[in-house]
């Protein structure tokens, strides 16, 4: 298999997902009119309405039946397993990269003759098994620290501020000094904390057990020249992981003992209401922030400075959103699904929905003329032009969903004071070896 995460970085920015294994034999039966039909199991809850609207419009234009079902946050793997076991299984689904593909390889049709593959600006970003194109990314995504410009400008104007402009915040040490000072002066700034709540409800915990955990993996893999899923990790940069997580806990809107029930919506609301200056999330968050009343000139995004190579560190950019066509579906349904995808990425309706309404940045040539309206995407594009090194999405190599969950549980226990950091180390290092072995036994 050849899939180069770092070549994906060379394109541009914007959701996160995880997908797992199933060994069922579901297939999809085509509709009676011979046109085939489409069933898309969508990963992104925040784009559910937009996908349903696209399905309705496509059916209106072509007469082809399109069904869209959306998995609740954190349940995609479970729902995909369930749906694939049915007679009318999804004709279109997603995997997160090579690890997800390994679990679903018997269900992936060759997409080399489909429009999404043909439209790729850089065909290296496709997911391949030998010469077979098994998945095509439809969103290049970026995350970091979203920041509120007006709150930071207010802080920069204070006497004794640890930074005088956003350009001064270019390292972990400066970021922490600013966050600590903002927390101490929160009444002057009219905020509840420097950072939004680090919630560990399933709608939020992925930000820490997956996205933040990507950074120690990235730096370890860079140092050790790891290019494929390793059987074990050392945890070389766990001290830096702890430093950033501690900052999130100490300089927060919320007492750490309350984090187990805090949600993604809570963090989004805190940030949109101006209760916090920093919010770890990605380009996909713009639609929710916009709905909450934020304006494009209110926000931008900084790297999650990790204290390893801050001078060169850029935002975290990659893809975990690969479309796959179900090879078990009827030929008519596979053709109908490919035709639907062609319409989605080449029609005015589809391009507008994906780029504007969903706020995604795609790797397709057909989107070249799209004006960027998402300020977080603009930050990602600017970051790529900065000469800095974008951090790869190495969490695609995480061995299992269980590894993430065990790490998340250890992080929450640590945050609440009911566990210690050694348990986080154990979940990270020992848990990796255990889950890798379980996934590769036999």
Residue spans of the language-model regions?
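Hinge/lid segment of periplasmic solute-binding proteins
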Residues: 96-153, 298-303, 385
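Extracytoplasmic/periplasmic solute-binding protein
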Residues: 132-138, 143, 173-229, 276
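Conserved N-terminal structural module of periplasmic/extracytoplasmic solute-binding proteins
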Residues: 3-14, 18-19, 23-100, 113-116, ...
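Extracytoplasmic/periplasmic substrate-recognition and gating elements
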Residues: 292-359
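Paired acidic/hydrophobic, glycine-rich loop segments that form the ligand-binding mouth/hinge
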Residues: 91-94, 277-281, 300
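Glycine-centered hinge/linker elements that transmit conformational signals in sensory
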Residues: 179-180, 224-261
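Short helix-initiation/N-cap motifs at beta->coil->alpha
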Residues: 70-79, 170-174, 259-273
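C-terminal capping/gating helix-and-loop segments adjacent to ligand/active sites or protein-protein/ligand interfaces
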Residues: 261, 317, 360-362, 379-434
């Amino acid at each position: 298999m050849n899939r180069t995460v770092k070549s994906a970085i060379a394109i541009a920015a914007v959701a996160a997902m995880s997908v797992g294994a199933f060994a069922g034999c579901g297939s999809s039966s085509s509709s009676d009119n011979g046109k085939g039909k489409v069933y898309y199991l969508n990963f992104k809850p925040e784009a559910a309405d937009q996908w349903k609207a696209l399905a309705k419009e496509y059916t209106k234009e072509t007469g082809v039946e399109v069904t869209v079902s959306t998995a609740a946050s954190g349940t995609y793997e479970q729902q995909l397993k369930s749906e694939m076991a049915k007679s009318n299984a999804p004709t279109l689904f997603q995997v997160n990269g090579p690890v997800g593909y390994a679990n679903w390889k018997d269900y992936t049709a060759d997409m080399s003759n489909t429009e999404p593959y043909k439209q790729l600006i850089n065909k290296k970003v496709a997911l391949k098994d030998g010469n077979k194109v098994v998945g095509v990314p439809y969103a290049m995504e970026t995350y970091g620290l979203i920041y509120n410009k007006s709150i930071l400008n207010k802080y920069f104007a204070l006497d004794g501020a640890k930074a005088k402009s956003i350009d001064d915040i270019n390292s972990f040490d400066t970021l922490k000094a600013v966050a600590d000072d903002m927390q101490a002066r929160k009444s002057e700034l009219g905020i509840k904390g420097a950072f939004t709540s680090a919630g560990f409800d399933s709608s939020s915990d992925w930000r820490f057990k997956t996205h933040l955990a990507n950074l120690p993996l990235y730096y370890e893999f860079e140092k050790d020249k790891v290019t494929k899923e390793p059987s074990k990790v050392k945890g070389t940069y766990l001290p830096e992981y702890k430093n950033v997580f501690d900052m999130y806990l100490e300089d927060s809107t919320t007492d750490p003992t309350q984090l187990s029930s805090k949600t993604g919506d809570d963090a989004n609301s805190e940030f949109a209401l101006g209760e916090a200056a920093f919010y770890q999330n990605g380009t996909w968050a713009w639609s929710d922030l916009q709905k909450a009343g934020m304006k494009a000139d209110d926000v931008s995004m900084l790297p999650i400075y990790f204290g390893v190579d801050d001078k060169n560190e850029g935002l975290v950019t990659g893809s975990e959103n690969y479309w796959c066509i179900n090879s078990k579906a009827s030929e008519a349904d596979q053709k109908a699904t490919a035709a639907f995808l062609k319409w989605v990425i080449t029609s005015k309706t589809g391009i507008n929905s994906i780029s504007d309404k969903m706020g995604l940045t795609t790797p397709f040539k057909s989107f070249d003329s799209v004006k960027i309206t998402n300020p977080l995407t603009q930050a990602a594009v600017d970051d790529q032009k900065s000469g800095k090194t974008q951090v790869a999405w190495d969490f695609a190599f995480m061995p299992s969903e269980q590894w993430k969950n065990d790490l998340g549980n250890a992080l929450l226990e640590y945050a609440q004071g009911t566990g210690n950091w050694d348990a986080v180390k154990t979940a990270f290092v020992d848990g990796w070896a255990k889950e890798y072995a379980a996934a590769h036994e036999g």
